[in-house]
Amino acid sequence: MAWFKTALAAYGATALFILLWSSGAIFAEIGVTHASASTFLTMRFALATVMLALIGAWRHRWLPARGTRVHVAATGALMMGGYSICYFLALERGLTPGLLAAILGAQPIATLIITERRFSAMRMAGLFMAMLGLASIVFRGASALNPSTTEGLALALAALASITAGAIMQKRIVQEPMDVLPLQNFVGLLLSLP
């Protein structure tokens, strides 16, 4: 019975994460049609900050370990602030969620290219094919862009750069996610304030 609870916790958390993450683009597009990107993000980060503060109070841990807080905050500035702000502004400027998702789909590939020290021929061929596939989708979608949505494309690339740099920095953090998320989310809230 214990193995079932462990499996349910592991797979349930993973399934919940995938559900929440994948539905994000849909709710983001709905959100920016009814509020500015700044207002929507401020409300989103404020709600998450309250929820994380409640969890922190229950756990009796509010902040990451001393000596890591600046790095954790800088990582949050990129992953929570930079990524989210650029993402929502790209939608607000008219970039479609599909094109935005295709551009951001390059993040794992970009992270691997930057962090990998040795590449096998097979891995390079796979990365090249993945980049070609993404590029064909992005260029097909970008060809329909008008000058007003070109800014959205630049913001999508800034979101990609932010999430890639943040993911690389996050790899150096060896604390539990619940030890770093409250501070990272709070930094995102501060950056999103109008």
Task: Show which residues each predicted segment covers.
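Specific transmembrane alpha-helical segments of multi-pass solute transporters/efflux pumps
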Residues: 20-25, 53, 57-100, 136
